[in-house]
């Protein structure tokens, strides 16, 4: 029996009957020989961590554009916090931690530069149905490894596709909107817990809002400190979830659901749409819009940038189609977009 097979047997012996054991994965688009040491989901997690897209998350916006402070979240730190929260919930419920972690680490790989402002630009210039979750699937399926993709398992791909959607329903009842595995559904909740808590923490740290402005009901239920918010929401999910009519349901109590909606509404009205944040996103949208048009009309510049970003199977021959330019823009970090915009559109002193 290999080390991998021992892991798989341990999962079968320990995990909840509602968990997704590695040995029962539906597999990959392109079949591969199994690893003698790692399970399928462990391999997926490792492939994501070693991907270019994952490394680029460190220079992509969470809420505040290119923050100068050392303690503000980036898209990478957000991803790591989601993974930690999701693993904690999965462990408490005897779900597959490796699958949970892989989905959590991959859920934002397709996020645009400048956060959701960048996503709005690509909706307008490329296609109204563009979303960072769909772009994350493109990243792992056909952009990473110079067009080869990461060839992840069906379960991880499904979880990435079904993670939370901004101002949408926290836990929709429609089966088509939630992941097919309990692990994927845990990541959806963990994503929301993470951004509600850390976006509020960053907003208070930056001075965009004060502690006194936070709805008193939210403070009473969740606590004042960042760690109190996270712990309270995690415990509520763990204690509220469980078996119902022969099926496991991932949910929070009605009281917690209402508080989370109240806090999310507060963040949208007072942080995400605050003038100091919105005005910077307006500038970011201008940068990405002009870069999009520039690369659509400059083949050589597009191919050079695609080579730098290590996109496509043959970036030196790639055509600047709308899809390809969208892939290029979405792959950029805030820093790359800013420096490239400056190089292209700002005059260079001759002497």
From Swiss-Prot:
**What family, per the record?**
Belongs to the dGTPase family. Type 2 subfamily.
Q: Which NCBIfam families match?
A: dGTP_triPase, PRK01286.1-2
Q: Which UniProt keywords apply?
A: Hydrolase
Q: Which GO terms describe its molecular function?
A: triphosphoric monoester hydrolase activity
Residue ranges of every copy of the HD domain listed in the record: 75-196
Kindly give the Pfam families that the UniProt entry links to this protein. Answer: HD, HD_assoc
**InterPro entries tied to this protein:** dGTPase, Diverse_Catalytic_Enzymes, dNTPase_2, HD/PDEase_dom, HD_domain, PHydrolase_assoc_dom
List, alphabetically, the HAMAP family matched.
dGTPase_type2 (MF_01212)
State the source organism's domain of life.
Bacteria
Keyword set includes Hydrolase: yes
CDD domains, alphabetized: HDc
Organism of this sequence: Desulfatibacillum aliphaticivorans
- Supply the name of the protein: Deoxyguanosinetriphosphate triphosphohydrolase-like protein
């Amino acid at each position: 029996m290999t080390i991998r097979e021992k892991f798989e047997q341990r999962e079968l012996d320990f995990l909840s009957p509602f968990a997704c054991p590695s040995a029962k994965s539906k597999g990959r688009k392109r079949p591969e020989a199994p690893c003698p040491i790692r399970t399928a989901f462990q391999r997926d997690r490792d492939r994501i961590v070693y991907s270019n897209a994952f490394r680029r998350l460190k220079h992509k916006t969470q809420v505040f554009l290119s923050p100068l402070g050392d303690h503000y979240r980036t898209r990478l730190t957000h991803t790591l916090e989601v993974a930690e929260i999701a693993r904690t919930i999965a462990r408490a419920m005897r779900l597959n931690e490796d699958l949970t972690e892989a989905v959590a680490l991959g859920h934002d790989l397709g996020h645009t530069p400048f956060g959701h402002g960048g996503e709005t630009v690509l909706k307008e210039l490329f296609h109204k149905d563009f979303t960072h979750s769909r772009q994350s699937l493109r990243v792992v399926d056909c952009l990473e490894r110079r067009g080869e993709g990461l060839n992840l398992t069906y379960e991880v791909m499904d979880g990435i596709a079904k993670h939370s959607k901004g101002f949408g329903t926290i836990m929709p009842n429609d089966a088509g909107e939630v992941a097919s595995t309990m692990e994927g559904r845990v990541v959806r909740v963990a994503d929301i817990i993470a951004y509600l808590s850390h976006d509020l923490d960053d907003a208070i740290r930056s001075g965009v809002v004060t502690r006194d402005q936070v709805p008193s009901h939210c403070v009473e239920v969740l606590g004042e400190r960042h760690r109190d918010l996270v712990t309270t929401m995690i415990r509520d999910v763990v204690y509220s979830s469980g078996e119902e009519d022969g099926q496991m349901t991932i949910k929070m109590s009605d009281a917690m659901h209402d508080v989370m909606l109240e806090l999310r509404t507060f963040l949208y009205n007072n942080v995400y749409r605050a003038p100091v944040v919105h005005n910077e996103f307006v500038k970011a949208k201008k940068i990405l819009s002009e870069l999009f048009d520039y690369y659509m009309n400059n083949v050589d510049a597009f191919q050079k940038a695609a080579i730098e970003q290590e996109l496509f199977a043959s970036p030196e021959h790639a055509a600047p189609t709308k899809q390809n330019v969208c892939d290029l823009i979405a792959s950029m970090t805030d820093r790359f977009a800013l420096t490239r915009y400056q190089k292209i559109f700002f005059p260079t002193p001759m002497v």
